[in-house]
Amino acid sequence: MRKYIIMVFGDMEAQYILGLSYYRGEGVEINSEQGVYWFEQAANQGDADAQYYLGVSYANGEGVVKNYKQAVYWYEKAANQGHADAQNNLGVCYEFGKGVVQNYQTAYFWYLLASANGIEKAKDNMDRIAQDLSPSQQIEIQNRATRWFENNNGR
């Protein structure tokens, strides 16, 4: 047991897996608070999956008090590492003004990245708000996304 505890306290992947186990109730009883605790440990070391799940936890109020500003904070950390689901969820926050000032251009940007990273619903989300953007705005955002991919190793 001591070896296991030492491994978990130092290893962000093990921390993330333990958080996910508590969050989903896999091998242990569901305990959202414990899930959030372990996600925080891994997220603070830079684990994008843990950052994403912290965002989900804050957005849904699971294991923590619902707080969209915190959800956006964690989604943004994960999204900037190329986490496609976080990119889509960040787009949702910007589209509907959850935790941020509503901004269709920023929402479109994050949906575009998520779509390029394989999230099918992001394309639908992007199409939905495209009608509120001019063609020149869409082109500008597409160029920004291209630069983002170039600067982030295609993630």
Regions from the language model: what does each represent?
Residues 1-4, 42, 78, 114, ...:
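Alpha-helical solenoid scaffolds that mediate protein-protein interactions
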Residues 8-11, 15, 24-26, 31, ...:
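Short helix-capping/linker turns of helical repeat alpha-solenoids
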Residues 5-6, 50:
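Acidic, proline/serine/threonine- and glycine-rich low-complexity intrinsically disordered segments
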Residues 15-24, 53-60, 64, 89-96, ...:
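Hydrophobic face of amphipathic alpha-helices that form TPR/SEL1-like repeat modules
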Residues 120-155:
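Terminal, low-structured helical/coil segments at or just beyond the last alpha-helical repeat
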